UniProtKB/Swiss-Prot annotation:
GO terms for biological process: L-histidine biosynthetic process. It comes from Clostridium botulinum (strain 657 / Type Ba4). PROSITE patterns: IGP_DEHYDRATASE_1, IGP_DEHYDRATASE_2. It is found in: Cytoplasm. This is Imidazoleglycerol-phosphate dehydratase. Keywords: Amino-acid biosynthesis, Cytoplasm, Histidine biosynthesis, Lyase.
Length: 196
């Protein structure tokens, strides 16, 4: 499949982030955000989505990880949107249910051009490594609104918070992979409006 590559660089008073993405890759990653647990989750997303991802981030982690996590979501969303280009022949929708031992998560995506997010998580700890668990939703919101997609993410059940979050990121990768997959039968874009 033809490569779909985009690069985004963003610098603010709080973070400096550069990213390169290939939506039709092999799941190769080089990710360094300064937040090891986030790096792990992004690696899982990329690997299971077969997305090649390079991402380097420096942020004001001495304050906390909020700015870095949110801004990584912003940059990845912008990169994703740019890499999609005209969206011709993509399937548009993707859904994945992923089990991780006792946990089960689902993610459904619509590459609609209409940003919207619904998350249903009930994490029972405040932090995993350096990552506040509440920032999982902040990351997804930033990604969603900058990519221009609708995203529904849910942990159906689970006990281990690491497993729950890991299942969400793997499901995100798989849902993205399904949604960006091209079907030669789709002439133009998958919309009766003619645009996405």
């Amino acid at each position: 499949m033809k490569e779909s590559i985009a690069k985004v660089y963003r610098k603010t008073g709080e973070t400096e982030i550069k990213s390169e993405i290939n939506l039709y890759g092999e799941g190769k990653c080089d990710i360094k955000t300064g937040i090891v647990f986030l790096d792990h989750m992004l690696n899982l997303m990329a690997r299971h989505g077969l997305i090649d991802l390079k991402l380097q981030a420096q942020g004001d982690l001495q304050v906390d990880s909020h700015h870095t996590v949110e801004d990584v979501g912003i940059v990845l969303g912008q990169c994703f949107k740019e890499a999609l280009g005209d969206k011709k022949s993509i399937k548009r929708y993707g859904t994945s249910f992923i089990p991780m031992d006792e946990a089960l998560a689902s993610v459904s995506i619509d590459i609609s051009g209409r940003p919207y997010i619904v998350c249903d998580f009930n994490f029972t700890v405040d932090k995993l490594g350096e990552l506040d668990t509440e920032l999982v939703e902040e990351f997804l919101r930033a990604l969603t609104f900058n990519a221009g997609i609708t995203l529904h993410a849910r942990v159906l059940y689970g006990k281990n918070n690491h497993h729950m979050i890991e299942a969400v990121f793997k499901a995100l990768g798989r849902a993205l992979r399904e949604a960006v997959d091209k079907d030669k039968r789709i002439n133009g874009v998958m919309s009766t409006k003619g645009i996405l």
